[in-house]
Amino acid sequence: MKSIITEYINEDKRYQELNEVFGKENVLVTGLSGAAKATIIAEKYLNSEQQLLVVTNNLYQADKLESDLLQFVEDSEIYKYPMQDIMTEEFSTQSPQFMSERVRTLTALAQEERGLFIVPLNGLKKWLTPVDMWKSHQLTLNVGDDIDIDEFLNKLVNMGYRRESVVSHIGEFSLRGGIVDIYPLIGKPVRIEFFDTEVDSIRDFDVESQRSEGNIEHVDITTASDYIITEDVLKHTKHKLKQAYEDTRPKIEKSVRNELKETYESFQLFEAEMFDHQVLRRLVAFMYEQPATIMDYFKEDAIIAVDEYNRIKETETTLVTEIDEFMQNLIESGKGFIDQSFLQYEGFENLLKPFAVTYFTLFTATMPVQLNEIIKFSCKPVQQFYGQYDIMRSEFQRFIQNDYTIVVLAETETKKERIQSMLNEMHIPTFIDTPSRRNEGGSAIITEGSLSEGFELPYMQLVVVTERELFKSKQKKKPKQHKTLTNAEKIKSYQDLKVGDYVVHVHHGVGRYLGVETLEVGGVHKDYIKLQYKGTDQLFVPVDQMDQVQKYVASEDKSPKLNKLGGTEWKKTKAKVQQSVEDMADELIELYKAREMSVGYKFGPDTAEQNDFEIDFPYELTPDQSKSIEEIKQDMEIERPMDRLLCGDVGYGKTEVAVRAAFKAVMEGKQVAFLVPTTILAQQHYETLIERMQDFPIEVQLISRFRTTKEVKETKEGLKSGFVDIVVGTHKLLGKDIQYKDLGLLIVDEEQRFGVRHKERIKSLKNNVDVLTLTATPIPRTLHMSMLGVRDLSVIETPPENRFPVQTYVLEQNTNFIKEALERELSRDGQVFYLYNKVQSIYEKREQLQMLMPDANIGVAHGQMNERDLEETMLSFINHEYDIIVTTTIIETGVDVPNANTLIIEDADRFGLSQLYQLRGRVGRSSRIGYAYFLHPTNKVLSETAEDRLQAIKEFTELGSGFKIAMRDLNIRGAGNLLGKQQHGFIDSVGFDLYSQMLEEAVNEKRGIKAEKQDAPEIEIELNIDAYLPAEYIPNEQSKIEIYKKLRKIESETQLMDVKDELIDRFNDYPIEVERLLEMMEIKVHALHAGVTLIKDVGKQVEVYLSEKGTTDINGETLFKQTQPLGRTMKVGVQEGKMKVTLNKTGNWLDSLKFLTKSLEESMVITDEI
C-alpha cells in the first residue's frame, strides 16, 4: 500500500540513516509532529518483515496515530490494544467493542503474525494470561475432526463464553441435541453439528433468524475475554484470595470487616460452570503463578517505538498514584484486598529492556537508557488557509519557487477535481495520482487520502496539505474492515414474550403471560399459552389461536390493570377506543382531501450551483440521507405543496438534508424560514447555515433573543423586501408582524415541542408553502400505514461513517471512577455532561465535583431555572466556557455539543431505556470516541428490569442499534406526538399494537380499501393425536412460540419445507410428536387450496367439510379417479349444499388423510380465487 508520500520519504538520506538503526539500537528521533511521525513509522514497517510496536501515552493518542497509519498500511495489518484507565476496565460491565479489539491483537501476537501494533501505556502495564495458556485456548475445528465434546464445552467456558438456551449475543454458546451454536468475539456466529464425537458440519448462521447461511470447512474460535480462567486457575485464585483476605482483615477497621467478609465470600462462591469473567477479572493478581504482560507476547526481534517518552512517564507516575489511592479506598471500605493489583508496578521502560527502542520526541529530552544515536528532523506545520484564496495562492507559489513537491490529499474523486481546478486557476503545475514517477520539484500532486494534519519537511522539499488546511474539514476516519460488531447485536422482535409480560387478548383484554404449557385434554397432548387475568382467573389459549394474543406495549414502565375474564369492562374499553379511532380516521381523511386539492409552487430541476454546493459537503452521505434528499426534491418539483416528515436519530445528518432543500429553494428566488423550538438551537442552525453557504451569495439571518432590536428590525425589513433569503428563528417567526416577500419553504425542527397556537399557524402555512418537518423521535411504522397520503415520510436510520459507537460502562458509583473519567475527558480538552436528576441537591453536587476537580469550570442547568438563564448557561457550555455541566434530563433533546464526549449518569437504574439511549446520543457526535458511564448506587440490589435495561444499553453499543431498542418506548411517544395527546389514553388502554391495527382498519374502511389478507383463511383441524413441540426438543419457550407462529402462517409446501429445514438446522432431527404436527400442517396446506373449512376426528372416522365455493369448484370425475386407491375407506356426501368426505381410520390413516386432501386440491377446477 505504498503512497506517494512514503516514496519521497524513502529516498531521503535522513530517513535512510534512521532506517539503518531503527529497531537495532537505542535511538532518539526529534522534531517530528503527529502525521509526519506516522508517515516515518509506516515507512519503516513497510520496509521490514518484523512486528512493530508503538507505545502511546493514552488511548486518544493511539486512535489518532491509527487514523494516520491507515493512510499507508492495510487495516488488516494494524492492531490496536485499546485500554481505558485500568480501574474502569476491571470494575465495570462494558461494551464488547474494546474487548474484541484486544482479543484480536493478543491472538495475532500469540500466532506470531507480523503487524503494526499500537498499545497505550495502560495496555502495556496490564497483567495478562500467560502466553502458553492463551495459545492452548485458540480453537480451530475442521469438518471430520473427532473431539471430546465435554472438554470442548469446558474450554469455551474457560475462554469466557456464557452458556445460554439460544445464542443471540457475542460471547454466548448453546447446546441442543448434537448441535453447538457459538457467537465468537471475532467472526460470524457458527453452528457446529456433531455425529457422535465427529464434527459432521460447520455452518455460519444468522442470530436474527437463527437459520444457517452456508457450510464452511473450518472455523477459528478466539476467546470471548482477555483472560483465560480454567478450573485450576480458579482454584489458585481462591487459594491466593484466602491468603489476601487473612492478610487484609487485621489491618482494617473492625466496622468494615463484615463488608470484607461478604466481598471475600461472594468471590469464593464462583463455580467453574457459572463464574462471570466480568467480575473475576478484578482478581487478576491472584489468578496466575506467573502473570504475563503484552511484551511477553512479542517476538524477540520486534521493533519498538515509544511516542513522546516524557509524556508517557508523567502519565505513568499519575497512574500509579491513582491506582494506589483507589486500592487503598477499596481496602478501607472492605471491597478490596492487599496485593490486589491490576498492573505491573515497575517503570514501563523495564518491560522494554530486552529490546532496542526508538524514542520519538518533538524536542530533545533525557532518556532512561544509553542512546546510540540522535537523529534530528526538521518539520513545520502547514498554514491553515480555510478557503482564503489569496493566502493559499501566495503560500503555494512560495513552495513552487523553492522547488517543492506539494502533495495534496483529497478524500473523494469530486474533491480531487475541485482542488485541481482551483490550483489550475493559480497556475500551479498539477498532476493527479502519479505514484510511480518522481516529479521534478515545483509541482503539485493531488491524490486520494486523509491525514489528521498537513506538514512541511523543508530539507526534503516536500509539503503535504490536507483538506483540513484547505477548507477546515475534519479528517474522515477510514472505517476499519475487521470491526465485527456491525449489526451483530440486532434486537429480536419486541414481540418476544417473557414470562410475566403483559399481553392483550383481542377478545378478553389485558392479562399476564405465564408461559407455554403442554396439557393433556381427552388423552391428547397439545401446547397452550397460559394467561393470568384479574384475581385467580386463568385462560389457556391453544397455540393455533396465538395471533389473538399480542404483547402489551404502552407508555414506558406503565403497568396496566388486568381485566376480569368474562366481564364487560373490556368490551366497553374497546368500544370507546373504536369511537375515538373512527373520529381520528375522519380527521385524517379530511386532511388527505384538502392536501390533494391545494396548489403550491413547482420547483424546477437542480441547478449547476446546487451541484457545486452539494460537492462542498465534507462527508460522504449515508444511503438514507441520499434517499431522503431525493424524496424531498421530488416533492418540491411537483405542484402539490410538500408536507414531509424527516425522521432520524440524533446526529444522523438531518440538518444537511434540510440545508440542501433550503439551497434549492433559494436558487429559484424563494425565501426559506427555518423554525426551531429553542434559542440555542436557532443559534446552532444559524451557524451551520452560515458555514455551509459562505461561498454563495445567500443572505442568512437570525431572529432570536440574542439579536439586538435594531438587528431584528433590519431582518424583518429584509424579509419583506426579499433581501434576506433564509431566516432562522424560534416561534417569533410565526408572528403576525413578520412578512415574507416570497416564502417558498418552511423547515420545522421538532414540531411537537411547539404550543397549540404555533402549531395552528404552521398548519395554515402548509396550504401553499412546502413544509419539511424534522424529528428525532421515531415514528411508528404501523402508523405510517394509516398516515399514508396525509403526510409523506423519510427515515434516516444509518449513522454517518466516522461516528464511533459510544463506549458504554455500567458500574457502581465510586468517587475515583468519576474523578478519573472527568480528568481523562478534560485532558483531551473535551467537556462532560454530568447528569444528576435531583434539582433540590444539584448545587451540592456541583460543590462535590468542584472539590474533585478544583481547576475545572463547572456549570449547572435544570428545568426550574428561568428560560433565559438556562439558555445562557447552555450557550456558555457550547462555547467551552464550562468544562463540566451538571444537569438534569433537560439535555435529553436538541443540544449539540460535539466537544462534549463524556456522559456520566448517576442513578442510571432509575431511567427508562429510551431515555438512557437518547441521553447517550448527546456524546460521541464528532470523530472522537464518546464515553458513557451509567452509575448505580453501591450495595443496591437492582430490580430485574433496571438490570435488563442497563445490560441492553451496554450490549447495543453499535450505532443505530439503540434506535432499534428504544424504538418501542419512543414509538409510543411518537404516536402521541403524531396523533395528539388525547390519543395517549386510548393507546394505553388497549395497547399500542391493537390501537394501530384498529386505526388502520378504520382509515382503510373509510377510504374504501379492502384490508389485506393477514393470515391464511382459518381451517379448523381437530385430530386426536399428539402433535406439538415437546420441551425436550425445544426447551426455550421463546423459540417454541416463534416456530408455532411460523407454522400458523404456512400456506404452501415450499413454506412447510422451509420450516422443516429450520427445525433440523436449529434443533436436529425431530421426534414423532413434531413429525405429526408437520403432517397436520401438510394436510392444512392441501385443505386450504381445496376450500376445506373443517377436518374433524369423530371416533373411528375423520370428517372433511368443504365450503360452498369449494364444493362447486371440485371436478367430481377427477376426484373419483384420484381417490381410487382409498377404495371403500372413503365416502363422499353432501350436507346443506356442501360436500362432506368421510374417511375410515384404518391402517396408517394420517397418510390416507394427507392423500385425500392432496387429491381434493388436485381435483379443483382452476379459477382466479380460492
From Swiss-Prot:
GO terms for biological process: regulation of DNA-templated transcription; transcription-coupled nucleotide-excision repair, DNA damage recognition. InterPro entries: CarD-like/TRCF_RID, CarD-like/TRCF_RID_sf, DEAD/DEAH_box_helicase_dom, Helicase_ATP-bd, Helicase_C-like, Mfd, P-loop_NTPase, RecG/Mfd. It comes from the Bacteria. Its EC number is 3.6.4.-. ATP binds at residues 648-655. GO terms for molecular function: ATP binding; damaged DNA binding; DNA helicase activity; hydrolase activity. Gene3D superfamilies: 2.40.10.170, 3.40.50.11180, P-loop containing nucleotide triphosphate hydrolases, Penicillin-binding protein 1b domain, Transcription-repair-coupling factor, D7 domain. GO terms for cellular component: cytoplasm. Residues 635-796 form the Helicase ATP-binding domain. Keywords: ATP-binding, Cytoplasm, DNA damage, DNA repair, DNA-binding, Helicase, Hydrolase, Nucleotide-binding. It is found in: Cytoplasm. Pfam families: CarD_TRCF_RID, DEAD, Helicase_C, TRCF, UvrB_inter. PANTHER family: ATP-DEPENDENT DNA HELICASE HOMOLOG RECG, CHLOROPLASTIC. This is Transcription-repair-coupling factor. The lineage of its organism: Bacteria, Bacillati, Bacillota, Bacilli, Bacillales.
